[in-house]
């Protein structure tokens, strides 16, 4: 529906009733001529309005052009007539000048009452006035105007404004939710993508032939292999000593390895000596280790399964450490030498009832050295002198006597004042602490509706440009400030 700005009156020239006259034709001609003259008068009036508006706009445009022309003239004089050789322009004078900055004026409220054209205003004034419902506004409890229930020119604007503010609020809540999730789970964005399953490995295995493909679920068909002492490789499964020939002898070209007699070997230390019943076993192990080129004798066929031929016997487990206060075991037969004495055993320490020393308490004020126990007796001259034993934990100091009177002396003064118990005062309760405790316990405060509405009206502008700019700023901003006038989560009814 187009908005008619100007209507030429009268619209109809000949639609009138004729009076009771004899000359009807002459009367009709006069009425039509009068209506044409009235239309010409209305047209001239509207032409004046149109040209008046054009004159106002042209005058504004001319004033802007004249101001720009004056600035251009001043700049032209400075540019063309300035001689840099004669007049020096200081750097300070250049920096003190402000740079040009254009001020953009947004065109809004195009259909406001102030911008209403005069013809439209005249058309509006011809309409019927609304009923005086504003007289009932003081009697309403909700504070709304009674006339707005009958006619509300700002209804569509308020509806659009409410929708824009709700969208802005939802955007801010969504951003706060994302920030909270990101803060709670910082590694959320570093999720490893799922590996794409392809049959490339399967085809790579099958390109050499189906018989070479090994299944991962089935165990390997090949038994584990073992390496002999002479470098040959053997298998663990189904090894029979009688079916295998002895390993080949070493080449005659290589020099024979030197053989050592048991008498020339040095005696083992006392900590790693073997017991007497293992001498024969130790001798066999040494002989197999010293001369690896000699093959061991083949076991009989009917014997019980034992170590396989060509295999080195497993090393003996390490002997237990020597016990305290026990003499070292005698060396095995054949290895002892009277000229080489065994190393001395580690010195034995006197047993102490407390294995873990408690943390040292503060030193006592006075200790009578006569009450300390005597030091332990030293070892024999042949052994090394043992280190001094750890001191016993100090007990309560004995009360010192003052001379022969037998009277107890005064107790020593305390070491520091830190041992005094501190007096615990009850916390001072005031209105602030009570309010804070109420908030922490989850009590919800009642929100003042009128105050919140007034704050929203003060903060949010009541025009289209301000609302749109606010929404754009919220959408494209990365601010971490969670406090906002749109935050409704902090208060609840």
Curated annotation (Swiss-Prot):
Domain WH2 positions: 431-448
UniProt biased composition (Pro residues): 293-377, 384-401
The UniProt record lists the keyword Cell membrane: yes
Annotated organism of origin: Bos taurus
Listed GO MF terms: actin binding; Arp2/3 complex binding; protein kinase A regulatory subunit binding; SH3 domain binding
A Pfam family the protein falls into: WH2
Its job: Downstream effector molecule involved in the transmission of signals from tyrosine kinase receptors and small GTPases to the actin cytoskeleton. Promotes formation of actin filaments. Part of the WAVE complex that regulates lamellipodia formation. The WAVE complex regulates actin filament reorganization via its interaction with the Arp2/3 complex.
Transmembrane segments: none
Descriptive protein name: Actin-binding protein WASF2
């Amino acid at each position: 529906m187009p908005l008619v700005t100007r209507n030429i009156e009268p619209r109809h020239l000949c639609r009138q009733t004729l009076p009771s006259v004899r000359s009807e034709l002459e009367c009709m001609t006069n009425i039509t001529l009068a209506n044409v003259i009235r239309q010409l008068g209305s047209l001239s009036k509207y032409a004046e309005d149109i040209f008046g508006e054009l004159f106002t706009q042209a005058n504004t445009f001319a004033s802007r052009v004249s101001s720009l022309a004056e600035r251009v003239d001043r700049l032209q004089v400075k540019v063309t007539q300035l001689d840099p050789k004669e007049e020096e322009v200081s750097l300070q004078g250049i920096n003190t000048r402000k740079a040009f900055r254009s001020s953009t004026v947004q065109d809004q409220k195009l259909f406001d009452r102030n911008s209403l054209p005069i013809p439209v205003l005249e058309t509006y004034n011809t309409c019927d006035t609304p009923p005086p419902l504003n007289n009932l506004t003081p009697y309403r409890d909700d504070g709304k105007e009674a006339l707005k229930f009958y006619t509300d020119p700002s209804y569509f604007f308020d509806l659009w404004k409410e929708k824009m503010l709700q969208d802005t609020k939802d955007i801010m809540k969504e951003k706060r939710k994302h920030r909270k999730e990101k803060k709670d789970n910082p590694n959320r964005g570093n999720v490893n993508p799922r590996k794409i399953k392809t049959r490339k490995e399967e085809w790579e295995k099958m390109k050499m032939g189906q018989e070479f493909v090994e299944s991962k679920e089935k165990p390997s068909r090949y038994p584990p292999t073992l390496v002999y002492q002479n470098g040959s490789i053997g298998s663990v499964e189904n090894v029979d000593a009688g079916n295998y020939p002895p390993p080949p002898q070493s080449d005659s070209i290589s020099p024979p390895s030197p053989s050592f007699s048991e008498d020339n070997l040095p005696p083992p230390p006392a900590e790693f000596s073997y017991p007497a019943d293992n001498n024969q076993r130790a001798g066999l192990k040494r002989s197999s280790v010293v001369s690896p080129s000699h093959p061991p004798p083949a076991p009989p066929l009917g014997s019980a399964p034992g170590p396989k031929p060509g295999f080195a016997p497993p090393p003996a487990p390490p002997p237990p450490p020597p016990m305290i206060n026990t003499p070292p075991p005698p060396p095995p037969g054949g290895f002892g030498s009277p000229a080489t004495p065994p190393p001395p055993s580690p010195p034995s320490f006197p047993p102490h009832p407390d294995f873990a020393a408690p943390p040292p308490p503060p030193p006592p004020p006075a200790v009578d050295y006569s009450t300390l126990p005597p030091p332990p007796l030293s070892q024999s001259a042949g052994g090394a002198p043992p280190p001094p034993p750890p001191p016993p934990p100090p007990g309560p100091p004995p009360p010192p006597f003052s001379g022969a009177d037998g009277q107890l002396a005064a107790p020593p003064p305390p070491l520091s004042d830190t041992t005094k118990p501190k007096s615990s005062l009850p916390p001072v309760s005031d209105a602030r602490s009570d309010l804070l405790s109420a908030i922490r316990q989850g009590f919800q405060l009642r929100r003042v509706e009128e105050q919140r509405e007034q704050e929203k009206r003060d903060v949010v502008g009541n025009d289209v440009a301000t609302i749109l700019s606010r929404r754009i700023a919220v959408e494209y901003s990365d601010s971490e400030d969670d406090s906002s006038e749109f935050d409704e989560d902090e208060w609840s009814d």
